[in-house]
């Protein structure tokens, strides 16, 4: 004859079963969650990819975001004309005295323009866009490294944008530049999984925050701008990789690549070199040893445009020794990919993709390829447990 449980014991046993069931449910749910980190230096196209994810898998942009984008897009345009004006004023491009007045206004008082009444701001934008010297600039110097990439999209649309009734399209928001400060996370369902995509600022001052998100990462999506090969940024005396102060420092060998670095300028660092060194530092991080690495070699379209007039070997002399050292997009892209693979451990894999983040279908397709790899690896891992 069995021993009957008293009521308190029956209640406790039932509660334990309930807790165990809940734990099993949560464990199963956690196995379906994929944590992805989106990393890269500033202006690599990270935020554009996040916006594409929102368009493809979330609800896109709300009304408030669309209205706010009006001012951000116009500020993007004013900022672009600021840099263009500075270059024209310092060039041999012919400009009349009247044109010089407008160029100097944009070059040296762009912030004042941004603070003007809308009618005055639009009048100035519409005035500068039709200047003869601006047309000459775009004909000969449109891919100068100081010019923001998105002006190539916005300039042909200025007649539509520079009116008081303007309302941004989804395409406009995709091309809009906005510096990522802090951490932004979106979650969405993809097939049978829940994706947590975490985007952290690419500015050097923001990188110290990255370490807090390295634990439990399934995949790292690292974005590099292929078109940054002829761009430079100021070199800071402090360590660019802030987390290294508390973790194992990156070995010096990664800073001397057999593929070679760019020609150095005093006090400056090539942005492509900066991207490669940052990627290697992340890949060497102990927290991410078991993570999948997806390398987005972005802005393939802009690379092609630049290579029409710029010789890659003039910026990376080691390219002369490359197998196919012509100035083609394919050859240059393969060389750049090899820079990221330098010093790769035998058991580490990098899945590289050529991307154009401003094209929705391109990112949708590439993201699908990445997820196929990640999901298959997850299945392999779970089958071993």
UniProtKB/Swiss-Prot annotation:
Gene Ontology molecular function: any one: G protein-coupled receptor binding
Chain residues carrying a lipid of type N-myristoyl glycine: 2
Residues with a covalently attached lipid (S-palmitoyl cysteine): 6
Sequence similarity: Belongs to the G-alpha family.
GO-annotated biological processes: adenylate cyclase-modulating G protein-coupled receptor signaling pathway
Database matches in PROSITE patterns: G_ALPHA (PS51882)
Stated role: Guanine nucleotide-binding proteins (G proteins) are involved as modulators or transducers in various transmembrane signaling systems.
Spans annotated as G2 motif: 172-180
Record region (G4 motif): 294-301
Residues reported in the UniProt entry to bind Mg(2+): 47, 180
Origin: domain of life: Eukaryota
Keywords, sorted A to Z: GTP-binding, Lipoprotein, Magnesium, Metal-binding, Myristate, Nucleotide-binding, Palmitate, Transducer
Region (G3 motif): 195-204
Signal peptide: none
CDD domains: G-alpha
Pfam family, one: G-alpha
Oligomer and partners: G proteins are composed of 3 units; alpha, beta and gamma. The alpha chain contains the guanine nucleotide binding site.
Listed Gene3D superfamilies: GI Alpha 1, domain 2-like (1.10.400.10), P-loop containing nucleotide triphosphate hydrolases (3.40.50.300)
Record GO cellular component, one term: neuronal cell body
Protein name as annotated: Guanine nucleotide-binding protein alpha-5 subunit
Residues in coiled coil: none
Span list, region G1 motif: 35-48
Region (G5 motif): 355-360
Positions that bind GTP: 40-47, 174-180, 199-203, 298-301, 357
